[in-house]
Amino acid sequence: MQVNPNPNKVPVELNRTSLYLGLLLVFVMGILFSSYFFN
């Protein structure tokens, strides 16, 4: 078994992924609410 030479890489990638998922969720919610209000 090999030790990961850069242990800080995985949390950064995880935070970036969660950030993109949060932005996508806000984007989808904005579209749903705008379509709800404009109908």
Curated annotation (Swiss-Prot):
First-listed, main subcellular location of the protein, grouped into a coarse class: membrane
Keywords carried by this UniProt record: Membrane, Photosynthesis, Photosystem II, Reaction center, Thylakoid, Transmembrane, Transmembrane helix
Superkingdom of this protein's organism: Bacteria
Pfam families, alphabetized: PsbL (PF02419)
SUPFAM superfamilies, alphabetized: Photosystem II reaction center protein L, PsbL
Membrane topology: Single-pass membrane protein
Subunit structure: PSII is composed of 1 copy each of membrane proteins PsbA, PsbB, PsbC, PsbD, PsbE, PsbF, PsbH, PsbI, PsbJ, PsbK, PsbL, PsbM, PsbT, PsbX, PsbY, Psb30/Ycf12, peripheral proteins PsbO, CyanoQ (PsbQ), PsbU, PsbV and a large number of cofactors. It forms dimeric complexes.
Family to which this protein belongs: Belongs to the PsbL family.
Function (record text): One of the components of the core complex of photosystem II (PSII). PSII is a light-driven water:plastoquinone oxidoreductase that uses light energy to abstract electrons from H(2)O, generating O(2) and a proton gradient subsequently used for ATP formation. It consists of a core antenna complex that captures photons, and an electron transfer chain that converts photonic excitation into a charge separation. This subunit is found at the monomer-monomer interface and is required for correct PSII assembly and/or dimerization.
The protein's name: Photosystem II reaction center protein L
Species: Prochlorococcus marinus (strain NATL2A)
